[in-house]
Regions:
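Short, charged/polar "capping" segments at the starts of alpha-helices
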Residues: 37-46, 95-96, 117, 201-203, ...
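Short loop/turn segments at strand-loop or loop-helix junctions that form parts
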Residues: 60-62, 89-92, 107-115, 190-200, ...
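Leloir-type glycosyltransferase catalytic cores
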Residues: 236, 300-326
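Donor nucleotide-activated moiety binding/catalytic core segment of transferases
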Residues: 231-277, 281
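Conserved catalytic-core segment of nucleotide-activated headgroup transferases in glycan assembly
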Residues: 191-231
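A nucleotide-sugar donor-handling region in carbohydrate enzymes
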Residues: 111, 117-119, 123-195
Length: 326
């Protein structure tokens, strides 16, 4: 019997892998899970993974010597089998080698946050996927193929224009929605849930703090601040000391936290995060808004990524939160 293979490296990728299992009614599922050095990230992965029905889990842990030889060993093992579906969460090095070396019927890219938009624009839209970093060439020396001939299809909750080169299957987050229990939900009408940013988004913490203060003053509601798992320590410490903020650190993605604790958030705000999109899909009556980061306070290396995100927010009619000066 053919297997289905999932190569995942983040909590959100595993959530979306589970949605794919449900949508395509898949059995005989193998997970290759790639960990990194961030403890919160890895804890979230394990907490989600234990609730996923899998037939085999292969874990790749961080190593001082790198992951190259571990990748080689795992790819050689995976080559022994045939696959119906191959699901990948990104176009990283292991996936660029797995795709051309495994026998499978179809390849799907599942969402890894806003990064899916970048992958689509930079690689998939124009079939521009065979661009390699030098490190990929090492696999050639060991007899692996690196040229991708497969179509990389999408299982996604993002709304992309129809493309004749790829199949786009809509991920409606059905599994998450089905877990909502409206009769026992706790409605948080008097609080604002603010979702934090990763380390590379905002470079001026004082402006970041000012946005929180203006949000508090403008809305006259307590702010429950949920940090991003990659938030820098100095940002975390700054927010913790604000008297109008309740700091709430999670060991699971915010979508899972709300559902597992029967929380129905009535008001969610952030500067930039995929969770605004997923929460908008799950909680129809919630107010989901974003505060736009100005160019002068963001990391310029990712400014185009931020612009693409805000353009997509506008496309799906996500509301912008405008704050009066105080």
């Amino acid at each position: 019997m053919k297997k289905n293979l999932f190569v995942v490296a983040s909590p959100l990728q595993i959530i979306n892998a589970n949605e794919a299992i449900n949508y395509f009614s898949l059995i005989n599922n193998v997970f290759v899970v790639i960990y990194n050095s961030n403890d919160i990230h890895n804890i979230q992965i394990d907490n989600i993974l234990k609730n996923i029905k899998t037939d085999e889990v292969i874990k790749i842990k961080p190593s001082r010597n790198g992951k190259f030889f571990e990748y080689v060993k795992i790819i050689r093992y995976l080559k022994k089998y045939l696959y119906n579906y191959l699901f990948i969460g990104d176009m990283g090095s292991i996936n660029r080698v797995i795709i051309p070396n495994l026998k499978k019927d179809k390849v799907f890219l599942i969402d890894d946050g806003i990064g899916t938009i970048d992958y689509y624009n930079n690689f998939l839209k124009n079939s521009n996927i065979n661009k390699y970093k030098f490190s990929i060439l090492r696999f050639l020396l060991l007899g692996f193929k690196i040229n991708i001939k497969d179509s990389i299809n999408l299982f996604t909750y993002f709304d992309f224009n129809k493309n004749n080169n790829i199949e786009i299957v809509k991920n409606n987050l059905t599994c998450l929605k089905n877990r909502l229990n409206s009769s026992s939900n706790n409605f948080y009408d008097d609080d604002i849930f603010f979702l934090g940013q990763p380390f590379d988004a905002c470079k001026k913490l004082e402006e970041y703090k000012d946005d929180l203060h203006r949000l508090y003053k403008n809305k006259n509601k307590k702010i429950i601040y949920i940090p991003h798992r990659y938030e820098p320590k100095e940002q975390t410490e700054l927010i913790k000391n604000l008297e109008y903020v309740e700091f709430l650190k999670l060991n699971e993605p915010v979508e899972m936290f709300f559902i597992n604790n029967n929380i129905y958030p009535k008001y969610v705000v952030s500067h930039i995060t995929t969770a605004l999109i997923t929460l908008k899909m799950i909680y129809n009556s919630s107010k989901i808004e974003y505060i736009k980061l100005e160019k002068n306070i963001v990391n310029q290396e990712i400014y185009n990524h931020i612009l693409n995100t805000y353009e997509y927010y506008e496309k799906i009619s996500l509301e912008q939160c405008f704050l009066d000066k105080i």
